[in-house]
């Protein structure tokens, strides 16, 4: 069944039909399509456009179609142009003439705009739950590792001592912002396009506010042309998904590096690793690598939709059909990555001794040694030069700063006293950094309390 054709004298070329059809992918939102149709006919009856008997028969028919699709007794037929024509055709076959009234006061343009918003809204809720699960794992690691010392890095070189708790807190903040972005998008997109028609509304006395309420939207959209041609919310969503993937990719890169024999900071669980077909010793971080690799796929969806929309005049154009596969794939990709990544870090083992030893051997306490001199009256620029010379001496001797005797230290600067060793211990270096946002135990405990409160007060998107 076609939803059009009265003015045509020839059948559609089969290649044209195949090229034009979207049912192979828009069947994904059959639930949302039926939900929107039920709200539409409920409103039509309220407005006296349909009677209650017609409304009830249509709703029963639509519910039956949904139930049959879900049970597998009705298979979505790819010979139809789209999911809208499939549902309407099967409705008419079940309830006959009354089914032809379903589309009264509606265009496929506002119908598909509604379906995409309903689908996207549902998926944002799922994405939010997955992000919250990841945040819980990060929160658990933060609580457990407030005194797990490790080097912090700049330029991928050891810089200053921090804790694993502090490092995980950085990712907690990133993924918290990702949740905030999804929440912002949800609020901005939560307007109902149903009733906008093809582009100029309809002559029927529709109650758009009523259908918006039935479908849990905050209000109807305010302009009918914008309603059917707006894809901003999808671009925003793809941008937010790209940012989530960027954060996952950065984290994956660190896990891949930390998992190497050269670092040995972490060991990925067997359940989240794979082997080699030729090298029996290999245990590869494939999940982290695939998450990193799939980031470009999501970026590509964003750029594709931006490019599709950039030259389109108002209002609807068939180009917009390209939004669906891009969005569906990006959402599914991010959901899969979030789920797997959360499981991977939940089961990952951290090698505390190796991390601590790496911080000691990397001169991460050099800044604190310079601060020691400053606190004893040496100008910072001079202290910087003295400690640089001290580090060079340690490199030549293949030792850490702490390994030098007091005599050796005083040969470089007489300002050094016995208390230097306590001043540059990893514990002291970290504990002195107790300002807001720092790695010190007290500072981190405050952060952990705040994170617990955040997770408790933000159970789901709203």
Curated annotation (Swiss-Prot):
Which reaction(s) does its UniProt entry say it catalyses? 2-(N(omega)-L-arginino)succinate = fumarate + L-arginine
Tell me, what is an example of a GO biological process annotation in this record?
A: arginine biosynthetic process via ornithine
Which keywords does this Swiss-Prot/TrEMBL entry list?
Answer: Amino-acid biosynthesis, Arginine biosynthesis, Cytoplasm, Lyase
From which source organism is this entry?
Lachnoclostridium phytofermentans (strain ATCC 700394 / DSM 18823 / ISDg) (Clostridium phytofermentans)
- Gene Ontology MF term list: argininosuccinate lyase activity
Q: Does the keyword Amino-acid biosynthesis apply?
A: yes
EC number(s): the record gives 4.3.2.1
Family, similarity comment = Belongs to the lyase 1 family. Argininosuccinate lyase subfamily.
List the subcellular locations.
Cytoplasm
Q: Does the keyword Amino-acid biosynthesis apply?
A: yes
Q: Name one Pfam family in it.
A: ASL_C2
The Gene Ontology CC terms held by the record are:
cytosol
Identify the enzyme class. lyase
Q: Which PROSITE patterns match?
A: FUMARATE_LYASES (PS00163)
Query: What gene is it encoded by?
Result: argH
Name of the protein in question: Argininosuccinate lyase
Pathway it acts in? Amino-acid biosynthesis; L-arginine biosynthesis; L-arginine from L-ornithine and carbamoyl phosphate: step 3/3
Checking InterPro entries in the record gives: Arg_succ_lyase_C, Argininosuccinate_lyase, Fumarase/histidase_N, Fumarate_lyase_CS, Fumarate_lyase_fam, Fumarate_lyase_N, L-Aspartase-like
